[in-house]
């Protein structure tokens, strides 16, 4: 029993992985297409490389079954992740994770297309960051940017220590965005038949946004609803 417990303790959480890296030496526009996966974690940091790491708990031979293609075209970097036809969409949506590191000093505008259960964005610093796809849960931590979430599925969005704009663009969807008790922001409602609601302690409350702030939260689209939830201390 002790031997089994010891083996379990040292066993990696993701036994299968594939890593692709590429050196960058100037500011680039990133166009990243990941397709369907379970979880995407993207971080901007030091260094001069883009690193794409695929990991899985069940999919062996990731390098052969899931291909990462990086194209350097003038001032643009295209990243495409394509799975083998032998892997079903259901399988990768449950058992494939993608971790991406981007060089902060070379980040221009960034476009991300993916369908996933969870997306985490850490320290993203760029003029504009645009998500196109279907994501159920989004975490935005740190960074300074203008983030556009173009997603027609209901979202749970968590914001912490982020500076800048967040635009929620949806059609016929209801989403919730969570902020800390001390987070100050300006709220803007645009679009057609959109609703902007505010919630605290489980109850709808009056608008608790401020008139002017470097942080903007905007709802846009058609027949969509965004509830901004203030979390307790």
What are these regions (language model features)?
Residues 87-91, 116, 172:
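Flexible, surface-exposed loop/linker segments and immediately adjacent secondary-structure boundaries
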Residues 55-58, 80-91:
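Secondary-structure transition/turn motif
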Residues 138-233:
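Short, surface-exposed interaction patches in beta-rich subdomains
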Residues 85-87, 130, 137-139, 148:
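Domain-wide signal for the mature, well-folded portions of proteins, strongly enriched
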Residues 2-74, 93, 97-113, 118-124, ...:
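Short linear S-[DN]-x-LW-Φ motif typified by the pepsin-like aspartic protease active-site region
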Residues 75-86, 205-209:
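Generic recognition of long tandem-repeat/solenoid scaffolds
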């Amino acid at each position: 029993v002790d031997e089994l417990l010891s083996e379990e303790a040292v066993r990696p959480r993701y036994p299968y992985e594939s890593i692709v890296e590429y050196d960058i030496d100037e500011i680039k526009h990133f166009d990243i297409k990941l397709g369907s996966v379970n979880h995407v974690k993207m971080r901007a940091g030091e260094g001069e490389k883009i690193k794409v790491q695929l990991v899985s708990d069940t999919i062996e031979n990731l390098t052969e079954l899931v291909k990462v293609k990086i194209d350097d075209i003038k001032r643009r970097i295209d990243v495409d992740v394509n799975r083998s036809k032998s892997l079903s969409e259901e399988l990768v949506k449950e058992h494939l994770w993608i971790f991406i590191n981007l060089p902060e000093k070379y980040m221009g505008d960034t476009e991300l297309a993916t369908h996933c259960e969870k997306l985490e964005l850490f320290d993203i610093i760029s003029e504009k960051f645009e998500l196109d796809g279907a994501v159920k849960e989004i975490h935005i931590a740190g960074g300074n940017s203008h983030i556009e979430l173009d997603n027609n599925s209901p979202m749970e969005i968590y914001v912490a220590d982020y500076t800048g704009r967040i635009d929620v663009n949806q059609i016929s969807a209801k989403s919730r965005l969570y902020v800390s008790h001390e987070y100050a922001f300006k709220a803007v409602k645009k679009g057609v038949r959109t609703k902007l609601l505010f919630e605290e302690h489980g109850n709808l409350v009056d608008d608790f946004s401020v008139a002017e702030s470097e942080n903007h939260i905007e709802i846009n689209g058609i027949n969509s609803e965004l509830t901004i939830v203030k979390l307790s201390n």
